[in-house]
Each structure stands twice: as C-alpha cells, then as structure tokens.
C-alpha cells in the first residue's frame, strides 16, 4: 500500500476485466489485402537501407563470428545469447540485471519475421534481459531469407510470443526521432546502427 491505495499489476487488472465480462462478441471477419511484391527479398533490402539499416547476405558456411567482427572492427564488447556466437563477452541470459549490459558495443540477436513493406523485423524476447535490444550501441539481427513476408498483415499472422517472457518487438533500422521542425535524428534513444544479416 502506498498513500492508502493498493497497486494492481496490469495482468491482475486485465484478468479482473475478463472475469467480469459477461457478453463477448466474435471479431468481425475483415478481408484485408496487403501490398504484395514480386521480389520480397529485394524490397526488404531496399526498405532496410532506406530507413538507415545495413544488410549483409551471409555466404554458405561463412563464420557468423567473423562476419560480425568484420562489420564492426572497432567493437570491443559483444553481447548475445545465441549458441553460434562465441565472441560475446556478455550474455543477456546470465547477467544479474539489465544494467550489466551497459557498455555493449554490439548486441547480436535473431529475428523471426522480416517485412518487405517497411523493413521491420519481429524479434520475440527469447533472452532474460531484453535490454540488449535497446542498450547496445549497434545491433546485429540474423534473419532467414525464407522468413521475409510481404506486409504487416502477413507478419502478424506469423508472430509468436515465447510463453516464458511474453514480449516481442518490431525493429526497423536504427532508432529514430524527429522534432517539430522535422529534423531527423538516428540513434538517440537506442541502437545507433542496425545490420541485418540474411542467412
């Protein structure tokens, strides 16, 4: 109790609403046809680059560790929980708290769905500390080419939450913010740069 008022967690509040909802209605069927592309891979690469990201197509058998080091030769501190990455000094699954990821030069994660329409990549939280997505100076996202879809409608039909964490986010290039004068600043609030590695 703080100030005489009890605090209610979001999930408790939503569960209380669900218990007290006596009449439910099915969602209406809406036939939405999203934009389609002849070449989703080409469109995805173009959109990713247009929003300030970089794209590297990994060659078969190429070392992902070496590929990341080549992309960021000045980086000293890498963070990843992916088993195929052996250069990481920090692991978001084993750090004591999110703050321990501070000072990460390059965070390395895996995306599950890429969207050709806008260059977004769906990244479900599969690690204990999701801060690696936002606290890293630069972010490397591995994405399988076969997981690129045309539009957000197709993407939402495919996304799944990890039941352990129940969180995910779409990321499209480096962080961006713009003021009322429409001056665009990249990297002010999260990753200063994003590299998508297509595997």
Predicted features along the sequence, with ranges:
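The feature marks the mature, well-folded catalytic cores of soluble enzymes
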Residues: 2-199
């Amino acid at each position: 109790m703080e100030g005489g008022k009890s605090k209610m967690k979001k999930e408790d509040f939503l569960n209380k609403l669900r218990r007290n909802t006596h009449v439910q209605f099915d969602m209406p069927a809406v036939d939405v046809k999203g934009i389609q592309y002849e070449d989703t891979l080409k469109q995805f690469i173009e959109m990713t680059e247009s929003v300030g990201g970089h794209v590297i197509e990994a060659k078969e058998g190429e070392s992902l560790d070496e590929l990341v080091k080549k992309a960021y030769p000045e980086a000293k501190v890498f963070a990843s929980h992916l088993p195929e990455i052996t250069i990481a000094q920090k692991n978001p699954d084993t750090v004591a708290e999110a703050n321990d990821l501070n000072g990460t030069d390059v965070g390395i994660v895996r995306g599950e769905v890429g969207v050709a329409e806008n260059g977004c990549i769906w990244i479900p939280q599969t690690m204990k500390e999701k801060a690696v997505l936002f606290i890293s100076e630069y972010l490397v996202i591995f994405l399988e080419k076969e997981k690129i879809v045309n539009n957000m409608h197709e993407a939402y039909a495919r996304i799944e939450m990890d039941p352990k964490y129940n969180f995910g986010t779409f990321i499209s290039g480096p962080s961006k913010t713009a003021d009322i004068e429409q001056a665009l600043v990249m990297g002010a609030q999260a990753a200063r740069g994003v590299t998508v590695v297509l595997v």
